[in-house]
């Protein structure tokens, strides 16, 4: 591979762009130890991929990060609007975002309560990213939570040798537009650098009325010294999207009505045209201060403080409502519109210290985060005036969550072998109390303590091939909906997984092969039951024993400097063992449980929902202007 560089590529629209001044970025940055402390490298035994964002800039047309990286092994994508703009979701080995840990510059991005990753809240982050690492399986420790399906690490602290000003615009189907303006001073003689970006993205979407209006800005004020770097980063995203998360019925799908959107009709109960303001409206602000030090003895330290602020709502039309559910003393029935709000803050600090010698390195790290959020609802309009006085908030509950994580990662190099011992301890407290939309009162206060040990070994056979193995244990706590869903049969339990990985990598002059075999044995895995909650999200339930096992393969081949081929394959078995499903029957007269008519179904082995057994990807790339 000495004369050939493989670049991932998928078919895209043509991008129109203009660059007033451009330059090559530095690839060696002093003191980026906060990234080194949480990422895997060539010494570590993990199944991972790294994408330099400059390799995919020709595809950066406004779509979310899941769309841009979906070609990696074992990844799936779904998107509400149908074109990758707006709400998009990523799955790794069949596991959704609630099991994927996402960090931006070492700062956890997953929502603290739902563990979801809302890419729509950070539109065009890809334009500010330097690289993205995707790690499959539980992997080694990171700041904050631990992923079960995988982890994604995004680095935006980019050093520019020269100043530049760049404007990019693109347009395409469904009235899609993207405009991005970026500028940087480059590193000035005194070591200062200011980098900024502003973006605007809009699209009408493939699905009916699934329009998106997305805006964001990014600012990084940096100082590069002889033995330190400092970054103050401020970013903000705003999204306004028409709701399109209700899905498509099998009947409509078979009829060919793939663009149908029932949002704004209250599942067909509203007469006339769909409600025009059935929107999701959310703002999110991120502040990060990152300080890195390189001491004279070669040791490295980092300190990061951060704050994430979120505020917004989604609005919907509800038909034939009992007004008593919208405030004590209200009476009557009729249609209304309401807004369901989320107002939250996340504060945190990360610290790490790394000692590196000729044959070993040791990284010790600790992180702490504190989350507080309010959930409340407001009635916008009663189309039939109720009897009584409406409340300003017809439900209100708050939540608090603390997460304390500490880990120590020891790497020892002996001849051709490299050993990694990673020990992580997490302590989580999650509490919430108040009223729900149905006026019921609830409260819970849960504490979790997790010990997550991991062991890795890699063996370098020669300069172009290596073998690695990984064995680890990890846990992840239940999320908000697991505690609150009305159909939950019992209090949810944390998930626990044992993960084994075996891999082989080989390079030739014009090609490269990667093979990875994995086995993941779960205790109390939370899996979808097939039911949905009041907002259409899948209801999850613990299953005692289950597993995910399979193989991943990647192959690159370079025919010439201009023509290359890339493919990957994912094959897996995803099964639940000894599963009991309870079908509860109700009496029509009073909806009480009919015990005699209820039944229990026992499964010795059944598939896990949303978990494919085969994912395949292939591409042939021709670059006529390559040298």
Residue ranges and their predicted role:
Residues 66-108, 130:
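Extracytoplasmic beta-strand/coil segments of soluble accessory domains associated
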Residues 138-141, 150-187, 198-208, 399:
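Short strand-turn segments of transmembrane beta-barrel domains in outer membranes
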Residues 415, 519-521, 541-627:
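Gram-negative outer-membrane beta-barrel transporters
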Residues 31-62, 89:
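N-terminal periplasmic "start-of-domain" segments of outer-membrane beta-barrel proteins
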């Amino acid at each position: 591979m000495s004369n050939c560089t493989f670049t991932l590529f998928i078919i895209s629209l043509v991008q129109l762009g203009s660059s007033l001044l451009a330059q090559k970025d530095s690839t060696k940055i002093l003191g980026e130890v906060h990234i080194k402390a949480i990422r895997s490298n060539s010494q570590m035994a993990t199944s991972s991929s790294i994408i330099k964002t400059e390799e995919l800039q020709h595809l950066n047309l406004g779509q979310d990060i899941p769309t841009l990286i979906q070609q990696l092994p074992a990844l799936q994508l779904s998107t509400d609007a149908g074109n990758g703009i707006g709400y998009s979701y990523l799955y790794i080995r069949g596991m959704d975002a609630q099991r994927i840990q996402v960090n931006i510059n070492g700062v956890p991005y997953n929502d603290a309560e739902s563990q979801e990753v809302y890419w729509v809240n950070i539109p065009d982050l890809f334009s500010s990213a330097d690289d993205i690492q995707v790690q499959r399986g539980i992997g080694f420790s990171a700041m904050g939570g631990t992923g079960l399906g995988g982890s994604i690490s995004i680095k935006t602290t980019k050093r520019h040798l020269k100043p530049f000003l760049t404007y990019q615009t693109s347009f395409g189907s469904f009235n899609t537009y993207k405009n991005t303006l970026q500028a940087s001073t480059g590193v000035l003689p005194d070591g200062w650098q200011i980098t900024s970006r502003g973006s605007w993205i809009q699209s009408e979407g493939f699905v009916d009325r699934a329009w998106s209006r997305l805006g964001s800005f990014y600012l990084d004020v940096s100082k590069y010294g002889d033995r330190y770097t400092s970054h103050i980063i401020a970013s903000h995203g705003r999204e306004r999207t028409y709701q399109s998360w209700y899905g498509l019925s099998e009947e409509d799908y078979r009829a060919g009505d793939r663009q149908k959107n029932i949002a704004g009709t209250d599942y067909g109960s509203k007469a006339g045209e769909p409600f025009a303001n059935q929107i999701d409206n959310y703002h999110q602000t991120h502040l990060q201060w990152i300080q890195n030090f390189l001491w004279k003895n070669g040791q490295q330290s980092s300190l990061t403080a951060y704050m994430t602020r979120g505020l917004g709502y989604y609005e919907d039309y509800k038909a034939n409502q009992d007004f008593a559910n919208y405030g004590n003393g209200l009476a009557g029935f009729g249609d209304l519109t309401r807004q369901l709000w989320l107002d939250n803050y996340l504060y945190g600090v990360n610290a790490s210290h790394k000692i590196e010698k000729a044959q070993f390195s040791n990284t010790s790290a600790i992180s702490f985060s504190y989350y507080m959020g309010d959930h409340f609802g407001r009635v916008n309009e009663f189309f039939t005036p109720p009897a009584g006085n409406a409340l300003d908030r017809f439900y209100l509950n708050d939540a608090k969550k603390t997460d304390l994580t500490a880990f120590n990662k020891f790497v020892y190099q002996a001849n051709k072998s490299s050993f990694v011992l990673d020990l992580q301890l997490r302590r989580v407290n999650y509490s919430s109390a108040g009223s729900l939309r149905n006026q019921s009162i609830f409260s819970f206060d849960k504490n979790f303590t997790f010990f997550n040990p991991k062991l890795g070994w890699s063996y370098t056979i020669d300069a172009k091939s290596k073998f690695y193995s990984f064995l680890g244990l990890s846990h992840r706590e239940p999320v908000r909906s697991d505690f609150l869903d009305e159909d939950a049969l019992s209090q949810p339990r944390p998930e626990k997984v044992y993960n084994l990985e075996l891999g082989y990598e080989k390079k030739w002059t014009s090609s490269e092969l990667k093979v990875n075999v994995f086995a993941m044995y779960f205790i109390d895995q939370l899996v979808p039951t097939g039911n949905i909650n009041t907002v259409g999200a899948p209801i999850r339930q613990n299953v005692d024993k289950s597993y995910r096992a399979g193989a991943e393969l990647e192959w690159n081949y370079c025919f010439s400097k201009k023509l290359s081929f890339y493919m990957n394959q994912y094959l897996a078995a995803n099964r639940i063992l000894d599963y009991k499903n309870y079908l509860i029957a109700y009496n029509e007269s009073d909806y009480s449980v009919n015990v005699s008519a209820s039944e229990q179904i026992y499964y010795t082995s059944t598939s896990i929902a949303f978990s494919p057994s085969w994912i395949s990807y292939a591409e042939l790339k021709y670059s006529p202007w390559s040298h």
